[in-house]
Curated annotation (Swiss-Prot):
Protein name per the record: NADH-quinone oxidoreductase subunit A
EC number per UniProt: 7.1.1.-
Transcription is among the record's keywords: no
GO cellular component, one term: NADH dehydrogenase complex
A GO term, aspect molecular function: quinone binding
Gene: nuoA
Transmembrane segments: 9-29, 68-88, 97-117
Record text on subunit structure and interactions: NDH-1 is composed of 14 different subunits. Subunits NuoA, H, J, K, L, M, N constitute the membrane sector of the complex.
Record localization: Cell inner membrane
Pfam families, per the entry: Oxidored_q4 (PF00507)
Membrane topology classification: Multi-pass membrane protein
Length: 129
């Protein structure tokens, strides 16, 4: 049986190498890169075309609310994945979560649906305004 250290050590090494490599490349680019500011480099980039209007426009609050709701429900969907993987026995000795895991995740999913219904009833997802 592998110990947790033996299991997570390769992941830690890869993470450490990735962080060191990223900071090394950023540092080298900062030290060795040319610094020639120009007007073209400071203009906002819009899909390869010339900018139309100002880049400092106000957006409606609805866009931010929808973005926050997307992040919240996306993170909650990420929490569902490990539960789905661990719910049933794997045939190699792991007994699965059983009924307690099923009931607890049922409560979690019910809370998600209740939150979605609440948001829907509040009219947050209504774009008619």
């Amino acid at each position: 049986m592998l110990t947790p250290l033996q299991i997570y050590f390769p992941i830690g090494v890869v993470l450490l190498v990735a962080v060191v490599l990223a900071f090394t490349m950023l540092g080298l680019a900062n030290v060795l890169g040319p610094r020639r500011p120009s007007l073209v480099k400071q203009t906002p980039f819009e899909c390869g075309s010339e900018p139309v209007g100002s880049a400092r426009e106000r957006f409606g609050v609805k866009f931010y609310v929808v973005a926050l709701l997307f992040i919240v429900f996306d993170i909650e969907a990420i929490f569902l994945y490990p539960w789905a993987v661990l719910l049933l026995p794997d045939g190699q000795g792991y007994p699965g979560l059983g009924w307690p895991g099923f009931v607890s995740m049922g409560i979690f999913v019910f809370t998600l649906v209740a939150g979605l219904v609440y948001v829907w009833k509040k009219g947050v997802l209504d774009w008619a305004d």
